[in-house]
Each structure stands twice: as structure tokens, then as C-alpha cells.
Amino acid sequence: MPLPVQVFNLQSAVEPMQIDADPQDDQQNMPDVNYVVENPTLDLEQYASSYSGLMRIERLQFIADRCPQLRVEALKMALSFVQRTFNVDVYEDIHRKLAEASREVQNAPDAVPEGSMEPPALDTSWVEATRKKALLKLEKLDTDLKNYKGNSIKESIRRGHDDLGDHYLDCGDLSNALKCYSRARDYCTSAKHVINMCLNVIKVSVYLQNWSHVLSYVSKAESTPEIAEQRGERDSQTQAVLTKLKCAAGLAELAARKYKQAAKCFLLASFDHCDFPELLSPSNVAVYGGLCALATFDRQELQRNVISSSSFKLFLELEPQVRDIIFKFYESKYASCLKMLDEIKDNLLLDMYLAPHVRTLYTQIRNRALIQYFSPYVSADMYKMATAFNTTVSALEDELTQLILEGLINARIDSHSKILYARDVDQRSTTFEKSLQMGREFQRRAKAMILRAAVLRNQIHVKSPPREGSQGELTPANSQSRLSTNM
């Protein structure tokens, strides 16, 4: 039978006045889709070596689609690697893109990178041979699985489904791979088998970007006795599994734009057991976890969970720029922090999972910096503040206005003198108001309790009207109520 190969490509107002929202503000949280990275500082060979399988191919294709400078090199690397798989359709697609990219380079001689070469010819013999090999292997695995089912040996059937899933994955048919891995669930005879099945389903679901499926199977794996019942010290194998689950959950939370939850997941990963090249590298954990924490954690959380974390420190050693950004932010050196963020932005935009969130994360980090900068002061000179944040006074005023309207800064702006004043809060009046409100609530509850006690003491009860079709008898609930009042 022919092998069906389906190719999936991974991708309350403070001010009493009303202000019309700038349409650009509504788009601020929209993911960047069409952008071009012109000045990357990425070592492509080292970057690609951090991943394996379909993830390496997809990440290289993502870079090729968004960075003209690295397009030819990325496609050549992807073409070379895809020939180690049965993924014929992706091979042909990458070769077509490489031919187009090479023609573009030849038409713009000034942009030709050093060492540029003509793309290799389409290897039709490899294509035909690989299709035949894939078909033969599929038929063999299918026959083996039928024999296992005939013998009714659960362990063999489970392995047969896993082998079929591995083959479909190698061919790029993610839909059938997911079906095979999922079918293995009925033949799992131990917690270890269930965890292995969950990890396989999670891996394919990440490739398909089916994030709800990812979280569902992470939860299933974490609820197995082998993971759930262990407390305190875990053995190396269990810790490795838990790290994979936390990394996958972190990716799903990141995709759902739940950045604080994503940060917490990545921070729970163990550096010594982080070996998941099919999805992400330890460097990714450092970048994803660091930026999400920076955008959502307050100073205490940042110090306790990131800076003082002995495990996450090891991840940050792999990404010294991210580490320095976090320390600069914590030390309130915001100009240096924001400048360093701009320096790494191009590389972040080449990450297929982080790229859609770069603009939002950067905005949240900048807003948090503005809030922290102003929090100790009664008033702040906006000229000095603009210098500290490397921006103009008018742009800063717009940012502060938005923060005030969102209730993130309790302040008012003297637009003439360019001074930001903290709003005076009368703590005495506020405390009195809270006390009075609490007193009114206690009074209401006390009256309700007195009324209930009086009703019970006088044996007052209300008989519910008979329902349609009934003979007017008391319901069990009413009977019980009547008994309790007569006792």
C-alpha cells in the first residue's frame, strides 16, 4: 500500500476622562508574523547541533524563511540532514526553496556571502529509493504488528505501535504517528510504559502545535505513581522525565501567552537532566524562562526564584547575555538592561517558539521597569526618566499615560512641567472606610444568624408547593427539614 505522507510545518481606569485607544496599542499584543531579520549573530552550525530529528529541520526552515542572510546556509544544512530520514516531501520542498534562494543571491551579487555555491541537483535516485524503503519498512512493521496482535502479547503490541509511530514520524506523517503512539496506551502494563507513551504523544503534539493536547498528556504523565508518589529526592531517571514534562508544559504555556506560568515551568527544569533535543535545548530553557520571569515576576520573586536558584543559574551560564540582562534589571540599571535586550532581539526573532511573543515580552519588561523606577518616589523628573530609559520625553509621556490608564501606576502627569507625581493616598481615611465596611458586613451576618435562630426556635418552616404530577407529599429534603425542627 502507498505510504501517505502528510507534511506539517511547525509554527480600570485611574483618570476620570475617556481616551480613544490608539489602534496601534490594540496590535501591540499581536504576534509578529511578517518580519525580516537583517543582522543576526547566530552561529548556525552550533545552533542546529543542539536539536535532533524533525525539530532541527523545522528550526532551520524557520530561520531560512525570516533571515535572508542565513537563508542559503540554513537550507543547505536542512537539506543535508533531511536525507538521513524518510521525509521525501520535505526534501523536495527544501530543495525547491534552496534553488529559489540561490537564484536570488545570483541576481544580487553584492549580497553573495563568502563560500556561496550552486545548490546540489535534486537527487531523484535517492527520492525513489527512499520512497521504496519507506514503503517496505511500513509493510514489515504493519505485518509484525498484526502477528503480535494474533499472539495477544501486550508488550509486543505496544512496541509494535511505537515502532510504527517512529516510522511515520521519520516520514513526516505526524497525524499517523500521533495515532500510533496513542494506540499504545491500551497496551501499557507499567507506569514506565505510560510515561513513555505520554512523552511520545507530547513530542508529536508539540510538532503539531496542539498545545491543549500537550498539557493534557503532561498531566497524565505527572499523575502516574512513578512521578506523583515520589517526594523529596528523585532518582536520575525520574528527574529526567520530570524535566522533559516541565519543558513541554513551559512551551505550551508560552504559546498560550501565560508567561508567568511558563516561567515557573522552565524554572523547575533540572540542568543535569535536561536532554530533550527533539524539542528544545538547555539554552532555550535559559532564554524562555529568563525572559518570561523578567516580564512577570516582581523583585522578590525574581531574586528568590531566578537569581538565587542554584539550578537555573546553570542554565543562565549558557546564555550570559540573558543572565546579565536579569542582573541589570534587578540592580535597576534599566538603560543597560534595555540596550542589551535590543542587542539580542534579532536572534530571538529567529526562534520559532519565542518569535511571536518577543514584542509582548519586551513591552511587559519595559513597563515593569518603568513601574519599578517610579515606585520609591513621590515625584519624578520626566527628563531624567527619559534619559534613564533612552527615550524621548514625549514618547515616555505616552507610555506613562497608558500605564496610568491601566492602573499600573497610581500617579498623575504635570504635562507642562514634565513631572510625574504620585497620587497621595490618605491612609487614615482608607483604614476608616475599610473598618466601617467590615462593621457593616459583620452586622449583616449577625442579623441573619439571629433571624435563623429565631426561626428554628419557633419551629417555623415553609412547605414547598407540590410539584406537577405529585400528590402534595413532602420531598425528602422537606421531610428531613421538618424532622430536624421538631426535634
Curated annotation (Swiss-Prot):
Matches recorded under InterPro entries: CSN1_C, PCI_dom, Rpn7/CSN1, Rpn7_N, WH_DNA-bd_sf
SMART domains for the chain: PINT (SM00088)
GO cellular component: COP9 signalosome; cytoplasm
Domain PCI: 265-427
Pfam family, one: PCI
Biased composition (Polar residues): 472-487
Keywords: Cytoplasm, Nucleus, Signalosome
Alphabetical list of SUPFAM superfamilies matching this protein: Winged helix' DNA-binding domain
Residues covered by region (Disordered): 103-123, 461-487
Quaternary structure note: Component of the CSN complex, probably composed of cops1, cops2, cops3, cops4, cops5, cops6, cops7, cops8 and cops9.
Family statement drawn from the similarity comment of this UniProt entry: Belongs to the CSN1 family.
Protein name per UniProt: COP9 signalosome complex subunit 1
Source taxonomy: Eukaryota, Metazoa, Chordata, Craniata, Vertebrata
